Amino acid sequence: MVDQLAAGWLPAYGHEVVSSPSLDALAASGVVFESAYCPSPLCAPSRAALLTGRLPSEIGVYDNAAELRASEPTLMHRLRAAGYDTCLSGKMHFVGPDQLHGFEQRLTTDVYPADLDWTPDWRVPLSERLPWYHTMESVLTPGVCAASMQMDYDDEVAHRAVRKLRDLARDRARPFFLCVSFTNPHDPWELRPEYWDRYDPVEISLPSVGLVPRSEADPHSLRLRDMSGIDEVSLSDDQVRRARHAYYAAISYVDERIGEVLGALSAAGLADDTIVLFTADHGEMLGERGLWYKMAFFEPAARVPLIVSAPGRFAPGRVGEPVSLLDVLPTALELCGLEGSGRSLAGALEDGAVGDADVAVEYLAEGVRSPAVMLRRGRFKYVWCADDPELLFDLEADPLELVNRAPSEPELCASFGAEVERRWDMPALGAAVLRSQEDRRLVVDALNTGRPANWSFVPPAGTEPVQGKEDLYEFQRRARLDAPPRSSAMRER
C-alpha cells in the first residue's frame, strides 16, 4: 500500500511517462481494477474504512485526527482469529492509544502523529488556517536531496518487511497477512538524484485542465484553494512541471521499494501461494484544475489503483466496473476461505464480472462545513453537499469532468439524490461530526496541558535482533534463510 497515488499516474492505467517496472509486472500478472475508488480522499478515514469494510461515517473516523474504536473489528482481527500471523510494516495513520487494531506485530513506528491535534473545526472560517493545513510549500520546494525523512522511513519499511518475509519462510506454521505500507509518493516531494534523473524535464506535461477561473469553479474547489492558499501563489509552468517531475520520481522510488519486497517474497519461496494486493489510500490532484493534494472528488484524488495478483489461482485481466476499497475486506476473507459481509470481488477475479452497485465516497474533514458525498454509478459520478449545487459528470463522454450535467439531467439527479437520502441521515451525520470535533478539541486542550500524552507506536526492544533473551548463536543460525542444522557444539551448549 502507498499513500497519495492516483491510478492515472501509473503506466498500468495508461500513463506514458512514469517509470514503475515493479508495478507494471504486478499488473501484468494480476487483475487490474480500472475504476476503484477510495472511501474518502483523506488518509486516516480511507485507511480505517478499508480495514473495517465500513464507511468513515459508520465508524466515526471523520478526519485525520479521529480515533478508530479499539472495539471495531478489522480485517486483521478476523484473520488473526482464524489463525493468521498479522503484521504491519509501515504507516497506517491510527489515532489514539490502540496502535495495532488486530495486528499481532508492528515492525516500525508510524510517520504521522497518533494524537488528536489535527482535529478540524467547522466553526472556524477557512480563511483562519489551522497550523497543520496543507500549504503550497510542497509545490514550491520539490527537488533533489541526498536523504529525506520520507525516504529514510520507506527504506526502513521495505527492509523490515523483507526481514519478516525471511522469518515467515523459516517458520511456515501459520498462514500470514503482511501489510507493507509506504508513505511515498505523498508530499513533500524530495528524492535522491537516481530517481529524479530518470525523467527528462521535457517529458513532463502540464495538467490537462489548468487552474479553473474562480467564477467557473465549483464551491468545494474554491474552499480547497482558499484553505491551501493556492490562489495566493502564481505558479509558472516550470514550477508546475518541477512539482510533477518530483512526484513522478517519488513513484519510481516507491516502486523500487515494492520491487524489493516482491523480490524477497519470491526468494523466500512464498510467492506461489501468496495473494498480493496493491492499492493506495487516495489519489493526488497534481495541479489538475489548479488543485493539489487530495480532499476532492475529482478522478485524480478519488480513483486509486487496485491490483490483485495470484498467479496460478486466477488469470491476468482487467475489470472496468466501479468498485470500492470497502470491497477489499470481504474479498480478502473469501479468498482466505472465511466468511464476511459486504461485496466481495473474488468472483470478479475469476470472470471479470462485478455487477451493478453504487460506489460511495465521503468527505467529512477540513475544507467543508457539512458532509459531502459522492456516488459512482455506471458511467456517472454524482456529488452532493447541502451547501453546494449538485454536480453530475458523465465519465465516458467527459473523462476530465469539465461539464456539470446536473442542470440538464434532473431525473438522474433526483435518482441519485434519493439514494443519498436513503444511505445517509445528513442532519444527524453533520451533528455527529460537529459533536466529535468539539469533544476532541476539549481532550486536546487537556492532554496538551502539563505532561503531554504520547500514543506514538514504538516497537518493543525485545523484538529487535540480539535484544531478546535467547542464545546469540542460535539466533544468528536461524537468521539465515538456508539455516544449517545445529552443530554438535551448539547442541551441547
Regions found by a protein language model. Name each.
Residues 407-451:
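A contiguous, mid-protein "functional segment" used to position or interact
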Residues 1-384, 390, 399-415, 451-493:
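Formylglycine-dependent sulfatase
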Residues 396:
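Residues forming the ATP-binding cleft of Hanks-type serine/threonine protein kinase domains
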